[in-house]
Amino acid sequence: LHWAELVSGQFFQDHQKRFQRSKSADQMLLNNLKSVRQQLKKLQLDYNTIHDLLARIIFIQFLFDRKDSQGHPALNQEFLDHLHEIGELSARYSGLPELLGNHRDTYRFFRWLNDRFNGDLFPGKGATEAEREVEWRTEEQKVTQRHLNLLAEFVSGELEMETGQRCLWQQYSFDAIPLDFISSIYEEFVRENTTDKGVHYTPGHIVDFILDGVLPWDSEVWNIQILDPACGSGIFLVKAFQRLIHRWKKANRGAEITSNILKSLLERNLFGIDINPQAVRVASFSLYLTMCDEIDPRRYWQEVRFPRLRDRQLICADFFQEDREGFRTQLDSDQYDLVVGNAPWGKNSMTPLAKSWAKANQWETSYGDIGLLFLPKAADVTKPGGQIAMMQPALALIFNQVGTAKKFREKLFSKFKIEEIVNLSALRFGLFKDAISPTCIITMSVMSPDGEPLIYICPKPVLTNQDDYHIVIEPQDINSIYPQEAIKDPLVWTALMWGGRRDLALVRRLSKLKSLGDMEKNQIVVSTQGIIRGNRKERDETLIGKRILKQFPDETFLFLKTEQLDINNDPYAERPRKSKSKAFESPQLMIKQSWQTKTKRFRAAIARLDQQTQKGIICTESYVSVHVDETDLSVLEAACVSYNSKLAVYYLLLSSGRFASYIPEVKPKDLLRVPIPKYRVGLLNNIETIEDVDLYIRESFSFKDSEWILIEDIFNYTLPDFKGDNSSPGRQTTRRSSKNNSESVLTEYCEYFVRVLKAGFGQDKNVCATIFQEHNTAHLPIRLVAIHLKGSGTEGVQIEPIDSPTLLEQLKRLDKLFLDKANQDDGGIFYQRVARIYDSVQLNGQTIPTIYLIKPDKIRYWTRSMALRDADEVAADIMMWRSELDKTSEVMEESSRG
């Protein structure tokens, strides 16, 4: 195993089957818990009691497995014997399964544990002794010996699961229960019994990623107030608790953190809200386990007293309630230093209280989505200068262009300083197993904007099982967006998701060109989406007898032979409106709304009419029909060429939020924004192949070489990588495309890199490049290229062996550097997987400034468009250093004069 196989991700890609999350021990135990839960339900036990019992036996098993510094568990057979000797238990028991076989002793043991630990794990939390006793007796009557026998079989490993196998309980080690496991219990148990589909479990590594930005480990500030307004399983609060503990230890070096200090942190520094009472139960349990994790088990019985959290620090309520202390907009303003969490969202997810709050505070949202409202409400209860870091719906926050969405975005970005937005849209299938709509993370400060740009990060999937455990952020995934851009220009979010500043500039230019949408505003064209049958209550007799396009025939290219289409005999259609019926008249251009996987393009064709279709055809809702007068037929021909071209794919990926982040289908309004070329009569007569289409588009729009490269690389690599798998072109090695070690991919990369530097600093500059290639050794999963900035007697691109002693020594140093940085907050190549090193080398007796570029051996890192971006960044660095050098020189001159 070579170090580079790990840092590049190649090892995990080659051995994916060995790292399947579904076969991990915690996932298998979770399935066991689901099974026993259903069996208890069949025995007429309610879910609330089932959840309490399961949490209780997990905690008790934790006590059996958790060992102190001398290797002794907190609970064992000797301890149970002691409880018998002092009269707490009526008999001696060898372990938990045997104890569960006695209903009376089981509940005596539960009561004894409650006296020791207090907290919310057991019943009996009423205000008076009588109320507490009623709670205990109610549960004792509900839970029968049959229920306890089932649990005894379960924890002994004898209970048969639905799969026919025995359960895993005995093989699982409970001394260090993963947080993700507790969260998974929440996801599986709590969400299964709710109609609230806007709630989404947050993977642990995403929580760590969010907290790294707002609550990093390397600080001694621990006395801060943290709120999670939609706490769910409590994973944000638990991980925040762990970080506060770490900070306390750092601030009190040498001091031992006691149970009382931990209890104080829970009671004073952490606050959670959730509308689901089951979520509050799970969150409380998670925090108790975290507290126990910090204390030596020898001290459990003398020191540990869990604080009451439910209805105190963990509130079951709607965050938009204004009558509960702790999160009232006015009375509790400026209370928290930090608000974190994963807000629920979704169409029509708004609660009545949220609607009232939004109206009273003048915040509008789109489609009844509650998610965005958590941001301004959180800001109201956060101290000035405090921070908010929450997961949000990406479509609603950054992509949606309806009026209410624009107003919300403008108000939010104008009122608060937005620090960072991490667009996780490309990762959604890896992050969430139910593939919910795209999500993002927003970090904002409760202060007015200062004009500084926000950081916009769009990580991409590695397409290995690594995606289940961490996020890979590479340099090309990071862009800066200025506040006014964020407010006024919707293109920044889509263009910079898949491209860079050059792409944004090109898409902005293309958006100003003529399109069918513009021409419809000028009443030159009429368009409509195809018929939507809907509730089948509306009849339109004019639809009968027309041919209907349901799917383009395979051989369709530019023209549609309508005689191959079926005749429609169904008069029912909810849409389009009859005012748009002219769009179904001839001449017609039919445009497919979705990107085609097979051709990697969109598809459009002009309807060629037969005797049956002289007055036009209709189409299904997956198509758009565009009509013009006969005199403007050349408009449709020009548009037809554009929609079949690489340009349409490029433009729509970088301008349509739906296509860029969600599904490969574009809404009609976005589709009609595609720029169309110059139109002329008989345009299609000279176009016979798809290559002719692209050639005409390139010539008609007068694209520069650097612009066409952007279009081609998005088409050839970026989009197939997003919609494809490991076999997509951009994920192949650079060597696969080269013959006889010619290095065609890297050579083109270097040539365009050099071209950019010469364009910026002068064609007379002798900039050259070296591609390093292994010689008589196995191929590394990374590539190394050097760009030399001064004359060395050579030009162009050279290929050199990588086995020189000096270079190998340098790679060894890099090896150590990368591995050392892999565990640091800033990541290094294990996370960023790319390095750019500024150095100098001796060539022909000269000291030559040199830039080393080290990236994974995948084509997508070495495309021509990536060369343009990398060279732009290098040029910017050089200009910045020159500017700083000039300033230093001026200061030195002034000093010498003085």
Model-derived regions, located:
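P-loop NTPase catalytic cores that bind/hydrolyze ATP
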Residues: L45-L80, F285, G341, D380, ...
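Short, basic/polar, glycine-containing "phosphate-handling" surface segments that engage DNA
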Residues: L1-S69, Q141-S183, E192, P461-T464, ...
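Long recognition/docking surfaces used for binding and targeting
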Residues: H84-V190
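Polybasic, glycine- and aromatic-enriched phosphate-binding surface used to engage nucleic acids
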Residues: L372, A379-T382, R502-G682, A759-G898
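Structural motif
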Residues: K41-L54, S173-D180, T365-S366, E585, ...
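Signature of N6-adenine DNA methyltransferases within the class I
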Residues: A4, G9-R18, Q44, Y201, ...
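Extended amphipathic alpha-helical segments enriched in small hydrophobics
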Residues: S233, L237, P668-P720
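Conserved S-adenosyl-L-methionine
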Residues: T202-D323, Q392-L395, T404, F408
